[in-house]
UniProtKB/Swiss-Prot annotation:
Catalyzes the formation of N(4)-acetylcytidine (ac(4)C) at the wobble position of tRNA(Met), by using acetyl-CoA as an acetyl donor and ATP (or GTP). Catalyzes the formation of N(4)-acetylcytidine (ac(4)C) sites in rRNA, tRNA, mRNA and non-coding (nc) RNA, almost always on the middle C of a CCG motif. In hyperthermophiles more acetylation is seen at higher temperatures. Keywords: Acyltransferase, ATP-binding, Cytoplasm, Nucleotide-binding, RNA-binding, rRNA processing, rRNA-binding, Transferase, tRNA processing, tRNA-binding. This is tRNA(Met) cytidine acetyltransferase TmcA. ATP binds at Q265, G289, R290, G291, K292, S293, V294, S295, V296, G297, I298, R439. Gene3D superfamilies: 3.40.50.11040, 3.40.630.30, P-loop containing nucleotide triphosphate hydrolases. GO terms for biological process: rRNA acetylation involved in maturation of SSU-rRNA; tRNA acetylation; tRNA wobble cytosine modification.
């Protein structure tokens, strides 16, 4: 079916009255015709200094809404949309009274509401843009005139469906190239000023507008088209969705299959049907916008109603509640299609729980979901969740893992590399990949533009056998890349650099690229092979060198932007002198996923520390989620642990550790003291704040690169000494001598490199039973031993420690009589 794309007569007359050129109207009609015919999106940039761009957006969007509203029945019939109303989104940085953002919105609305009074207009500020997740719009007006974050760009643009238009309001490009935005102001950290902030990201964004198809540019003030389609169009051929055949042998209700828009979605429902009778695991991967979460939402309800359970509980988890909005929305819709009355619970405007008779589906953060009892566990955006947490869900009877490969939540092959490889060793599972987009058709130019500008599909360089030979010989060098060159000339090295993070365990956000591009204190380092290929990526933040006045404020509670390590040292170690010293904080370090565990990360650290030394810096440090693997990596590379956060990260489930490697003599003195203090605190924290810390992590936190014991006297009274000896001789039980054993165990962990050797299991036993005070049953389970064996082993360890350390305690004995 071919439809006419032409603004209604009254719209054209209104536009002429407002002095809108016919050529700009034709440009908009052509853009819409292209969008509908291809079921893609099109973008029109309206640049200008005045309110003219907002007025123009209001008139053009009004005309588009009127055209689209005429053909809603045809769109519904072809399953190109669900809603029977044209939905328009206006997104801006501010809507408060007397703000420029508000003035532009009012100017837009003044004209739009006259021309398209029946369209549903939603306005949102970037701060609350997550409120529109799970919704789909026909028209988007995105006001980038002052402030925006790249995260907003990725999140908002992807809400527009195929056949829709995006109007972007900007300042004149020449002005915008040199502008500082609110995002830029957030990057200023002492001792830098706004003048030090770069503008590489905006320039990249502007350049990308002109490089991709489907993007047209209008100077609103001059009423001049600067980039137009090759030829005008006044007709559009309505596209058809791919024909989806519903299998004959289905177990879920047919109504649920009728909600599917692609064969891939049907396959997801069929896969979950297999879980009705038998427990199992399904893994689902897709690029963004392929209907992955929607499919799981529909299938979960199918599983719930076909099971024989009276009350079917579904636990849904993801890094953030916003990640599962489509899933929960379609779970609710599926229930309604089947005639159920539903109840939803929302949190900050987002759906958190959906209930119907005998069915409950609820979101939990990753660290809490696996602790709940449920009949089905759904782990969405799994690549953004730390691998040890994923393994907790791996143990569940019925579990679905889904993950975005490329896109706003993407983590590339990292999910496969880090998790699925090991999962295969534990259990069988069915893997499905969805490739056909739902919201728009394949080949959408706006998706290509978005992926390009935000580097969402970046991947590292491919490695050959010759490259591995260079790695084995460690023929590598560290380099500081020219970020101006990388961003201005769109070098492949930039994609390879970001691609390493995308495929590593890091959870990437579009703003990470902008931070690297523009933050004055952020720099990149790369470890290259002799042939130039990047194998390790490092992002560093320059910290310290803080003025005394700011340091004094920090000591009283002020938190300066950036300067994470100096701020921690001032507040938690009262080391005000440290804030004057200068150093590198390693924000992110990752090695090519195909070259892991070959020593490249350690080599990169070695060369970075050498560079810092040559530049006269005082220290190199980092903050990260404290997994056993990472703590061991940093400690073995000579870094001292100086802090551990009191709470776990709700997404990764890890405590955050901060490590420092001192370079200057003054830094060595301060860091040595801080490391001693930390180790001392940890002996107490393990019985309280960090009672749930994994012993295998705790043991590495006690390690020190300085090799010396903490200078802290341990006291035992004469009676405690006697009771300790009676415990060793099997006269008294452990529970009656805890007060005497604990100081002895503390002495062991506060000792230096000369402490007696204990194996990993023995160390775990001391931490779990003595310092963390867990009972015998829990400790035996941890060690995979019987309770009796565990009791005997603890007594043997204490005997050895007592014979080794009792001479040190001799002079410290006190009598309390």
């Amino acid at each position: 079916m071919t439809i006419k794309i032409r603004f209604p007569k009254d719209v054209r007359e209104y536009a002429r009255k407002e002095k809108v050129k016919e050529s700009i109207i034709k440009l908009t009609e052509t853009s819409l015709a292209e969008a509908i015919t291809n079921f893609h999106r099109r973008m029109i940039i309206l640049q200008g200094d005045t309110l003219e761009k907002a007025k123009l957006a209001g008139i053009l969007a009004g005309g588009v809404a009127r055209i689209l509203s005429e053909y809603i029945p045809e769109f519904l019939d072809r399953k190109l949309r669900d809603e029977d109303k044209i939905e328009v989104l206006y997104a801006t940085d501010a809507l408060g009274e007397d703000t420029y953002g508000r003035k532009r919105f009012e100017e837009f609305r003044k004209h739009f509401s006259v021309l398209a009074p029946n369209a549903e207009l939603t306005s949102v500020t970037f701060k609350y843009s997550r409120d529109i997740l799970g919704r789909t719009f026909d028209i988007l007006v995105l006001d980038l005139s002052y402030d925006y974050s790249p995260n907003d760009l990725g999140r908002i643009i992807e809400t527009v469906r195929g056949g829709g238009l995006i109007f972007i309001l900007t300042n004149p490009f020449e002005k915008w190239k040199d502008m500082w935005t609110g995002f830029h102001k957030s990057l200023v950290t002492p001792p830098y000023t706004i003048d030090d902030v770069k503008k590489r990201f905006n320039r990249r964004l502007i350049r990308k507008f002109t490089e991709h198809k489907g993007i047209y540019i209008v100077d609103a003030d001059k009423k001049k088209i600067e980039r137009r389609p090759r030829k005008n169009k006044s007709q559009a051929k309505l596209p058809e969705r791919e024909k989806v055949e519903i299998p004959r042998d289905i177990k879920f209700p047919r109504e649920l299959y009728e909600l599917c828009l692609t064969r891939g979605q049907v396959e997801v429902l069929k896969a979950l049907e297999d879980l009705i009778e038998n427990p199992g695991m399904v893994v689902l991967t897709a690029d963004r916008g392929r209907g992955k979460s929607v499919s799981v939402g529909i299938a979960s309800i199918g599983l719930a109603i076909t099971s024989k359970k009276k009350n079917f509980r579904i636990v849904v988890t993801a890094p953030e509640l916003e990640n599962v909005q489509s899933l929960l929305k379609f779970a609710e819709r599926s229930l309604k299609v089947l005639g159920y009355k539903t109840k939803t619970v929302k949190e900050s405007g987002l759906i958190k729980e959906v209930y119907a008779k005998g069915i409950g589906i609820r979101y939990y953060p990753p660290t809490k979901g696996y602790r709940q009892k449920a009949d089905l566990y759904i782990v969405d955006e799994a690549a953004g969740i730390h691998v040890p947490i994923l393994h907790r869900y791996l143990e569940k009877e019925r579990v679905v893992f889904s993950s975005t490969i490329h896109g706003y939540e993407g983590a590339g092959r990292g999910f496969s590399v880090k998790f699925l490889k090991k999962a295969k060793e534990k259990r069988e599972y069915k893997e499905i990949h969805l490739s056909v987009p739902i919201r728009y058709a394949e080949g959408d130019p706006i998706e290509r533009w978005l992926f390009d500008v935000l580097l969402l599909d970046a991947e590292p360089v491919e490695l050959t056998e010759e490259d591995y030979e260079l790695i084995r010989k460690m023929e590598v060098y560290l380099e500081e890349p020219d970020l101006d060159d990388w961003f201005e000339n769109d070098r492949e090295d930039l994609r390879h650099f970001v691609g390493i993070y995308v495929l590593a365990h890091y959870r990437n956000r579009p703003s990470d690229v902008a931070l690297l591009a523009d933050a004055p204190h952020h720099e990149a380092r790369v470890l290259r092979l002799k042939n130039g290929k990047i194998v390790t990526a490092i992002q560093i933040a320059k910290e310290g060198g803080i003025p005394k006045a700011v340091i004094d404020k920090m000591a009283k509670g002020y938190k300066p932007p950036g300067n994470i390590i100096p701020d921690m040292m001032v507040k938690h170690h009262y080391a005000k002198e440290f804030a004057k010293l200068r150093g590198y904080r390693i924000v992110r370090i990752a090695t090519h996923p195909d070259a892991m565990d070959l020593g490249l990360g350690s080599k990169a650290l070695e060369l970075l520390v050498k560079e810092a030394q040559e530049k006269g810096l005082d220290w190199v440090g980092s903050g990260f989620g404290a997994s056993e693997e990472l703590i061991r990596f940093w400690v073995r590379n000579g870094f001292a642990v100086v802090h551990l956060s009191p709470t776990r990260n709700p997404v990764s489930g890890e405590y955050t550790a901060i490590v420092i490697k001192p370079i200057s003599e003054r830094a060595k003195e301060i860091v040595k003291k801080a490391n001693d203090e930390f180790r001392l605190r940890l002996t107490e924290w393990l019985g309280d704040t960090h009672r749930d810390l994994e012993p295998e992590i705790a043991r590495w936190l006690f390690e020190t690169p300085f090799g010396e014991a903490v200078n802290y006297p341990i006291h035992l009274t004469k009676v405690q000494r006697k009771r300790l000896e009676m415990f060793i001789k099997r006269v008294l039980t452990y529970d009656t001598v805890v007060d005497a054993v604990k100081p002895l165990v503390k002495l062991y962990f506060l000792d230096g490199w000369m402490r007696p050797y204990l194996d990993d299991r023995q160390i775990a036993l001391l931490i779990h039973r003595v310092l963390q005070a867990h009972d015998w049953k829990e400790t035996a389970k941890l060690l995979n031993r019987t309770e009796l064996y565990t009791m005997i082993e603890l007594r043997d360890i204490v005997r050895g420690l007592w014979y080794y350390y009792k001479h040190m305690l001799k002079d410290e004995e006190k009598d309390i009589s």
